[in-house]
Amino acid sequence: MDRRVCGVDEAGRGPLAGGVYAAAVILDPARPVEGLADSKKLSAARREALAPLIRERALAWCVAWATVEEIDRLNILHATMLAMCRAVDGLAVPPDAIEVDGNRVPPFVLDIPARAIVKGDATVAAISAASILAKTARDAECLELDARYPGYGFAAHKGYPTAAHVAAIERLGVLPVHRRSFGPVKRCLALGQQALEF
């Protein structure tokens, strides 16, 4: 029997708002998904087309996240590791090995061999699949934020610290979904730029 190797990746470490997402995917060698690549190299339309194929054909997959509150309490690195652990723990099928994009392996509870692979999202199919699921889930959250908080432009900048996003925070105030531990948000709070309750 083939070893069940789980790929793990995250999305949303750099934004000023929203959760950080992680996905874990065990691909089925009998049902390959063509066109997998690092989610950052794919168009949004291509990611949206691949995500349901991954979910349908994978042996197992799980998307998990850490909240804004957890990010602010733990820091972004530890919150990312927490989201990755939750994603692996949520798999319906236990993996035989875990491969994580990047240079750190989270403290998985499972006693399973795990290794970090730098640029794994571009070289390991299961990690590419995980990067696509994490990114599409994160993008979906940003569309929800855009609908809930008009004027901030979440659909366009996806929460990243663009000039337009920082200007919106300065103009409209800090929202409950903003990461208060991140520099630009912290500076706005220091200036008293708290948004009205939504």
UniProtKB/Swiss-Prot annotation:
CDD domains: RNase_HII_bacteria_HII_like
RNase H type-2 domain residues: 3-194
UniProt enzyme class: hydrolase
Reported function: Endonuclease that specifically degrades the RNA of RNA-DNA hybrids.
EC number(s) stated in the UniProt entry for this protein: 3.1.26.4
UniProtKB keywords: Cytoplasm, Endonuclease, Hydrolase, Manganese, Metal-binding, Nuclease
Compartments, as annotated in UniProt: Cytoplasm
Record-stated family: Belongs to the RNase HII family.
InterPro entries referenced in this protein's UniProt entry, alphabetically: RNase_HII (IPR022898), RNase_HII/HIII (IPR001352), RNase_HII/HIII_dom (IPR024567), RNaseH-like_sf (IPR012337), RNaseH_sf (IPR036397)
Manner of cofactor binding, per the entry note: Manganese or magnesium. Binds 1 divalent metal ion per monomer in the absence of substrate. May bind a second metal ion after substrate binding.
Reaction(s) the record says it catalyses: Endonucleolytic cleavage to 5'-phosphomonoester
Record-level Gene Ontology MF annotations: manganese ion binding; RNA binding; RNA-DNA hybrid ribonuclease activity
GO cellular component assignments: cytoplasm; ribonuclease H2 complex
Binding site for a divalent metal cation: D9, E10, D101
Name used for this protein in its record: Ribonuclease HII
PROSITE patterns, A to Z: RNASE_H_2
Gene3D superfamilies listed in its UniProt record: Ribonuclease H-like superfamily/Ribonuclease H
Cofactor(s) it depends on: Mn(2+); Mg(2+)
